[in-house]
Design a protein with these regions (language model features):
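Active-site-adjacent loops and short helices of periplasmic peptidoglycan-processing enzymes
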Residues: 23-183
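Extracytoplasmic
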Residues: 184-192
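Sec-dependent N-terminal signal peptides of Gram-positive bacterial secreted proteins and lipoproteins
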Residues: 2-23
Length: 192
């Protein structure tokens, strides 16, 4: 009986160990039939091995658009992660003028002039509905009342984490001169 159990256990062990290898080969075959990537650029990294598994135009500068909010989020969390509920900010009126100067159909979180919100709510407003006004409120606070100061902080942080082709000009991505690459976007998201 012991011999039978040992043989059965060995067989089960071999099957269990062989399944991942079989699945690995199968997924490689499936990738040949995957739909073509239509994005202008992509950069995929295996986070366990730090090996680039897919690269398409990863160094080509493109408009950062709302990915800009990821850098605003990174700076917010680096400085205030433990104070997200204890600090509340009031929306300054001038930020709405900045937003509407750039776009009349900008995405917002419907934060009104003069309303007060916690940093946590502003973070959610930036990330979920892509609220441009939330990014500007955070930038105003962190930049000491100056959006330009905050944008300088964004560009300094981008350089510090290894971004080589990224330039920010506003905290939310409305301005088309916010530029990044797929590789630099990966570095920003990895830092988060």
């Amino acid at each position: 009986m012991k011999k039978f159990c040992a043989i059965l256990f060995s067989f089960v062990l071999i099957v269990v160990l062989a399944l991942p290898a079989a699945a690995e080969g199968e997924s490689a075959a499936l990738s040949d039939t995957a739909p073509a990537l239509t994005a202008p650029a992509a950069y995929v990294v295996n986070l366990d091995t730090n090996i680039v598994v897919y690269d398409k135009n990863s160094e080509v500068p493109l408009s950062a658009a709302s990915l800009t909010k990821m850098m605003t989020t990174l700076l917010l969390l680096e400085s205030y992660q433990d104070q997200l509920d204890s600090i509340s900010l009031t929306a300054p009126s001038y930020i709405y003028d900045l937003i509407w100067e750039q776009s009349t159909n900008a995405s917002t979180a419907d934060i009104r002039r003069g309303e007060t919100h916690s940093l946590r709510n502003l973070l959610y407003a930036m990330l979920l509905p892509s609220g441009n006004e939330a990014a500007y409120i955070v930038a105003d606070y962190m930049g000491g009342g100056s959006i330009d100061n905050f944008v300088a902080m964004m560009n300094n942080e981008a350089a510090a984490i290894g971004c080589t082709s990224t330039t920010f000009v506003d905290p939310c991505g409305l301005n088309p001169n916010n530029i990044t690459t797929a590789r630099d976007a990966y570095l920003i998201l990895r830092a988060l």
